[in-house]
A protein has these predicted regions:
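Conserved subregion of the PPM/PP2C metallophosphatase catalytic domain
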Residues: 1-124
């Protein structure tokens, strides 16, 4: 899913990038040896994955949407306490559509939001 030079966003107590090493897409090369990567993610954190179609969405002036705008939308969503994956993707979609305006879509645009919810143990 992650076909972008940019790391996925982590949105919880703040907005940051998921620390990860670059890899190639799954299935691209059957001989590729992927490295195991781990990160601590806290309950309630939303992970936003996206293709380069988001960062490279272009308006009629040939300006790109880029990470600054993605972070701006994510920070606004966090301030409004609207970081549920569906809400976050809706806000990001609206922001990119407003930015692009009447320009033709130059690339596919895919986003996926995942929210980590820690399972609580039942009371004894």
């Amino acid at each position: 899913m992650l076909i972008s030079a940019d790391a996925p966003l982590l949105i919880g107590d703040g907005v940051g990038e998921l620390p990860c090493d670059a890899n190639i897409p799954v299935g691209f090369n059957t001989e590729w040896e992927y490295t195991l990567q781990e990160a601590q993610i806290y309950s309630g954190t939303t992970i936003l994955l996206f293709t380069d179609g988001l960062t490279e969405a272009m308006n009629i002036n040939y300006e790109l949407f880029q990470m600054d705008r993605i972070n701006e939308v994510a920070n606004k969503a966090l301030a409004q306490q609207r970081i549920e994956p569906r809400e976050l993707i809706e806000q990001m979609t609206e922001a990119v559509h407003q930015f692009v305006g009447e320009a033709e879509q130059s690339d596919d645009l895919t986003m996926m939001g995942i929210q980590f919810i820690k399972k609580t143990e039942p009371s004894a």
